[in-house]
């Protein structure tokens, strides 16, 4: 295996199959586009395990992902994709950047989920864009933007119910998609779904169970991740 990419939270390696990559989850934590950094023991293991449970569940509901196989505590094999330069964000309750941008009190539920795009470019601060921007930046076609939003809404509906069953409120989340290397006409869910990419609040207490514990210096970051993993594995 040869390393071919390293991001903030994961590394990618080649495998014997040119259309399959090995994805390794790191213990690194970042916030503010990398301005704040730390390492947490077992973070990679927990995020990998949480993503695996969620992706398998989504696959069972008909959502196509890049998942191929579980490998070990911190590695999975995934289909090789060309990641679209878009983060697709779904918001059910006001929090984070939405509350800051729009002056809406954190915890305010939305009448309907809000779906947003952000353009993946750290040097620009990952700006929020609309479908027209995405088209002009060659990030996605109009048809692909419609597909991405529809897929995001489907994922949201499934995840809301899934997390509710384990006592968690899905506040918001971001996901990424990629074109399959072996068939670029197919776009699948890629990257990860974990407390790094979701806001999850305990239904009974309202306690934050996600990366906001790191962003906001709330402490007990890994204890929260471990609790999320435990609930999901007991449910699965």
Swiss-Prot record:
It catalyses: 5-amino-1-(5-phospho-D-ribosyl)imidazole-4-carboxylate + L-aspartate + ATP = (2S)-2-[5-amino-1-(5-phospho-beta-D-ribosyl)imidazole-4-carboxamido]succinate + ADP + phosphate + 2 H(+). GO terms for biological process: 'de novo' IMP biosynthetic process; cobalamin biosynthetic process. Disulfide bonds: none annotated. Keywords: ATP-binding, Ligase, Nucleotide-binding, Purine biosynthesis. Pathway: Purine metabolism; IMP biosynthesis via de novo pathway; 5-amino-1-(5-phospho-D-ribosyl)imidazole-4-carboxamide from 5-amino-1-(5-phospho-D-ribosyl)imidazole-4-carboxylate: step 1/2. GO terms for molecular function: ATP binding; phosphoribosylaminoimidazolesuccinocarboxamide synthase activity. Its EC number is 6.3.2.6. SUPFAM superfamilies: SAICAR synthase-like. Pfam families: SAICAR_synt. It is an enzyme of class 6 (ligase). HAMAP family: SAICAR_synth. Belongs to the SAICAR synthetase family. This is Phosphoribosylaminoimidazole-succinocarboxamide synthase.
């Amino acid at each position: 295996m040869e390393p071919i990419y390293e991001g903030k939270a994961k590394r990618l390696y080649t495998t014997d199959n040119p259309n399959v990559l090995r994805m390794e989850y790191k213990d690194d934590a970042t916030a503010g586009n990398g301005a704040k950094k730390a390492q947490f023991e077992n973070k990679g293991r927990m995020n990998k395990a949480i993503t695996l449970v969620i992706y398998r569940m989504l696959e069972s509901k008909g959502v196509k992902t890049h998942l191929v196989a579980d490998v070990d505590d911190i590695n999975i094999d995934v289909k090789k994709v060309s990641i679209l330069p878009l983060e697709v964000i779904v918001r059910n309750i006001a929090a984070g950047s939405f509350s800051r941008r729009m002056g809406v009190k954190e915890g305010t539920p939305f009448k309907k989920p809000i779906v947003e795009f952000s353009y993946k470019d750290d040097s620009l601060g990952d700006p929020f864009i609309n479908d027209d921007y995405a088209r002009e930046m060659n990030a996605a076609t109009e048809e692909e933007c419609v597909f991405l939003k529809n897929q995001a809404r489907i994922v949201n509906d499934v995840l809301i119910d899934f997390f509710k069953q384990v006592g968690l409120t899905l506040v918001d989340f971001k996901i990424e998609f990629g074109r399959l290397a072996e068939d670029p006409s197919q776009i699948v869910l890629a990257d990860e779904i974990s407390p790094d990419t979701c806001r999850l609040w305990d239904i009974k207490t309202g306690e934050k169970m996600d990366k906001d514990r790191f962003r906001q210096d709330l402490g007990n970051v890994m204890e929260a991740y471990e609790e999320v993993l435990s609930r999901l594995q007991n449910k699965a």
